[in-house]
Amino acid sequence: QSLTDTEQGKAIGLSYFNERGFTDQTIKKFQLGYSPEAWDALSVAATEAGYSKDYLVKTGLSVAKDNGQLYDRFRNRVLFPIQNVSGRVIGFGGRILTSDKNKPKYVNSPESQIYDKSNVLFGLFTAKTEIIKKDNCFLVEGYTDVISFDQSGIENVVSSSGTSLTSGQIKLIKRYTQNITILFDGDAAGIKASFRGINMIVEEGLNVRVVLFPDGEDPDSYAKSHNADELNAFLEKNSQDFIHFKADLLSKEAGSDPVKKAGVVKEIVQTIALVPEQL
């Protein structure tokens, strides 16, 4: 409500989402929000609405000072609600809108009885029907990647919310499809860091494909600068089998060094060995 019903919400929060190109329909669909700059605006409103201080602290919406006073964890941040597969909001990601280097760009809800980040995927509630229909799940890194793709008409997309992929998240996807396509921006270090998570997907018996975006682009930016037909065509043209992708990437890095080339062969064989025998 503070996003659309208050001057501060409209001037700061809504302006940010509009600048990102999100329509009112998209903002409503993903229940995007804003937590005001005041230290305790949400805490006060929630306690007045009947929520106990203990509940607000346990769910991570508020933080208790030593004197028992509450302040808002997400103050002065835009909010990305995280839903479970049934659509219930169980946590939040909050993005800061100032360039304060002393504060993290994103703050997430702490783990609680209702929020276990290793068993949650952002966007899965809105994506699951389309994942079943398309028999494929696109996996991206950030909240805005999911939202921009959805707005472009590609709804079978989820995010691990910037955390390393877990076996619990892979099993969630497996409920709906055997096929995962991972979308990477051009950051080689980030791609290599994700290999462990991808090996876990292979081990779970799912088919993994990879799409690499051009340098300087990510799923969010590409979806904004191309229409739905162009985006679909790009994904189809650039989708490649993970094991081939991994072999190409590591081979380029190894160059003509025989020791490094032998290491590449060993690593690829190890990945292939993870594929369950029943496949």
Where are each of the predicted segments found?
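Phosphate-handling DNA/RNA-contact segment within nucleic-acid enzymes
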Residues: Q1, P36-Y176, I180, A193-S194
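Conserved active-site segments centered on acidic
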Residues: Q1-Q8
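Short acidic (Asp/Glu) and glycine-rich catalytic loops that position anionic groups and cofactors
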Residues: G21-D24, N102-V107, Q151-I154, K174-Q178, ...
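Terminal amphipathic helices with adjacent charged low-complexity linkers/tails
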Residues: I27-P36, L279
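Acidic, metal-coordinating catalytic cores used for nucleic-acid/nucleotide bond scission
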Residues: T144, L165, D185-S194, L212, ...
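Phosphate/diphosphate-binding loops
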Residues: I180, A188-V208, L212
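C-terminal or mid-to-C-terminal helical accessory/interaction module adjacent to the motor/catalytic core
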Residues: N207-L279
